[in-house]
């Protein structure tokens, strides 16, 4: 196994790139992650209506386009052609994660609150209202849009910077330009694309820099089955975001070829890490951007951790080392 831990520390992995610097899953976010010393990035893959593989997390583009008044500012990725999706622009204004509370982020949903367009206490109050009344995340998003539409538009115009959505090919081409050892966790967000993603990685000579995984069981096994029935590209690694390590997950791991698994921050300890290491499986922590958890990771011998707050982690690490 590669040694992700350096000087007794876990490898920081920028979740969707550095969201403090650019829209998530954008080239700016990925480039800043590399510049800040991340060991790798986590990114997401979906497929357009006409079969183009693209780098995008959400099923719908709306959350990341708030404030931008161009064409196709809402709609599902799977219903849009690449010609249309490539015209979508992702604004910086109002969308960067500049806030870091004193105790960090213990609630994953709060990363995506509209911190950049309203005062903190108002955001907390309004989001509590929206979430208590909504039946799903789409309704929460609609409420945010109605409440803060004009403010997003103002921030977007003031900042002026825009990014576009990357194709998977473009991402792999960028990945190959990074220093040796820099890697990507490639998360598949839907069924039916495993073979195409793996073949694209091989064609772009980026397979040895990739860990292909999913948090959806059916997609995890699609990845595993494809690699069993085809020749797995040299150097390609497979993973799964299992979140917790219980008997069900242990049985699953015994049946597949797993290089790495993701566990939710706070859901595991040294016993789980040791169990997985004995099986030759690397352990990555899913987020948990709190100083207390960052400190705990050093002692748990976790191999890597995904973070939405790479810049803040770097500041914390520098301060910690001066103690």
Functional labels for PLM-detected ranges:
Residues 1-323:
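Phosphate-group recognition and catalysis centered on beta-loop-alpha active-site segments
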């Amino acid at each position: 196994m590669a040694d992700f831990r350096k000087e007794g520390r876990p490898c920081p992995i920028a979740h969707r790139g550095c969201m403090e610097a650019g829209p998530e899953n954008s080239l700016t976010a990925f480039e800043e992650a590399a510049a800040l010393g991340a060991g790798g990035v986590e990114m997401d893959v979906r497929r357009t209506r006409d079969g183009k593989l693209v780098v995008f997390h959400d099923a719908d583009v709306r959350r990341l386009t708030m404030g931008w008044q161009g064409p196709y500012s809402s709609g599902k990725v799977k219903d849009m052609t690449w010609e249309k999706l490539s015209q979508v622009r992702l604004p910086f204004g109002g969308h960067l994660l500049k806030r870091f509370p004193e105790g960090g982020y213990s609630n994953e949903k709060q990363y995506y609150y509209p911190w950049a367009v309203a005062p903190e206490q108002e955001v907390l109050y309004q989001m509590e209202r929206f979430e208590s009344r909504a039946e799903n995340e789409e309704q929460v998003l609609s409420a945010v849009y109605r409440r803060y539409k004009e403010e997003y538009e103002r921030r977007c115009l003031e900042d002026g910077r825009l990014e576009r959505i990357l194709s998977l090919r473009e991402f792999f081409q960028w990945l190959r330009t990074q220093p040796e050892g820099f890697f990507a966790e490639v998360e598949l967000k839907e069924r039916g694309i495993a073979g195409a993603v793996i073949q694209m990685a091989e064609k772009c000579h980026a397979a040895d820099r990739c860990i292909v995984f999913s948090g959806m069981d059916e997609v995890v096994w699609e990845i595993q089955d494809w690699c069993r029935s085809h020749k797995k590209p040299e150097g390609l690694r497979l993973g799964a975001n299992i979140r917790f390590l219980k008997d069900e997950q242990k049985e699953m791991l015994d049946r597949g070829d797993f290089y790495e698994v993701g566990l939710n921050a706070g859901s595991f300890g040294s016993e789980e890490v040791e169990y997985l290491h004995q099986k030759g499986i690397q352990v990555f922590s899913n987020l948990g951007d709190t100083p207390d958890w960052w400190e705990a990771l050093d002692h748990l011998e976790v191999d890597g951790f995904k973070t939405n707050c790479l810049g803040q982690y770097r500041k914390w690490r520098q301060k910690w080392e001066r103690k």
